[in-house]
Amino acid sequence: MFTKIHPTKRKILDKALELFNENGLANVTLRQIALELEISQGNLNYHFKKKEELIEFLYFELFQQGEENEREIRNFTIWDFLQSYIAGMEQLYTYRFLLLDMEQVFREVPSLRDHFISISKFRDEAYTKAYLLGAACGVFKPLKKEELKIWVETIRLLGDSWITHAHRYGITEKAAVFENHLGYFEHWLRNYYMETTKAELNKR
């Protein structure tokens, strides 16, 4: 979907992403993006007629990257799981306006709310698969069906809210945002480790 993007179109997307992240979605116009790039608004409108088109493109670009990251997982150790989770955090942080301004995103492009809800099922299936694989490999404790459902719902909630939670309390620098989330994420996840997993982590 996103191969062979015209260089000017890519520059517009990158600048829009930068401004959306820095200033907030509601505070950025197509005119501002054009001024920052030192191009005419007509040139910008040739590629994106409306702000909604920019938002939609960036939204689906993020989800495409997430799918590619998922396909790259080959094995399952606790290190594989944590590295994959952090890679997902990096991707989300790059497109953080989508989380920080999620309701505004859905107001600007209502169809994205429907898409976001529809993919929740697939996200839950991916989380379930990851946990079951981890349990089969001796990383996680076996869970009953209802316990696994709660685990999946919790990790999805954490994934949707970690950036907004940090910003709400004035934590905005990237390293601090990551440290803030990973601290309580790893503390929560530790409750599901096998003793051998805990011992392996304690060696590091």
List each model region and its residues.
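Short, basic, alpha-helical segments at the C-terminal edge of helix-turn-helix-like DNA-binding modules
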Residues: 60-66
